[in-house]
C-alpha cells in the first residue's frame, strides 16, 4: 500500500471550494469577509456567499465558495480568515 505525501494536495486545481466562516452577527461581518476573500480570490463576489443566522440570531454562518487555484492560496486564505478578529471559526 502506498503512503500519501503530506505535501501533496487531494484537491484538483482549479476548482470551486466552499469554506464555512462563522462570527457574531454584525452589519459589517459580510462586507469584511468579502474584503478578506477578494485578496485571495480577486474574482470572488457576493453571489458566491450563502448566509445562515443562528437560531437566536447572535451568530452568522457564511459559506463562501472560492475558486481555488492552489493549496498555497487556500492555506493563506484560511490563515487570513482565522486570524481576523470578527471570525470565530473557519471550517
From Swiss-Prot:
Q: Which residue windows are coiled coil?
A: none
InterPro entries from the xrefs? UPF0250_YbeD-like, YbeD-like_sf
UniProt-listed Gene3D superfamilies: 3.30.70.260
Q: Which domain of life is it from?
A: Bacteria
Query: To which protein family does this belong?
Result: Belongs to the UPF0250 family.
* NCBIfam families named in the record: PRK02047.1
Q: What is this protein called?
A: UPF0250 protein mma_3250
Q: Which organism is it from?
A: Janthinobacterium sp. (strain Marseille)
Amino acid at each position: 500500500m502506498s503512503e500519501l505525501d503530506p505535501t501533496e494536495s487531494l484537491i484538483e486545481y482549479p476548482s470551486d471550494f466552499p469554506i464555512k466562516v462563522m462570527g457574531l452577527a454584525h452589519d459589517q461581518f459580510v462586507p469584511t469577509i468579502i474584503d478578506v476573500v477578494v485578496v485571495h480570490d480577486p474574482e470572488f463576489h457576493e453571489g458566491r456567499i450563502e448566509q445562515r443566522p443562528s437560531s437566536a440570531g447572535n451568530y452568522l454562518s457564511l459559506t463562501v465558495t472560492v475558486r481555488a487555484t492552489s493549496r498555497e492560496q487556500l492555506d493563506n486564505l484560511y490563515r487570513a480568515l482565522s486570524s481576523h478578529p470578527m471570525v470565530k471559526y473557519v471550517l
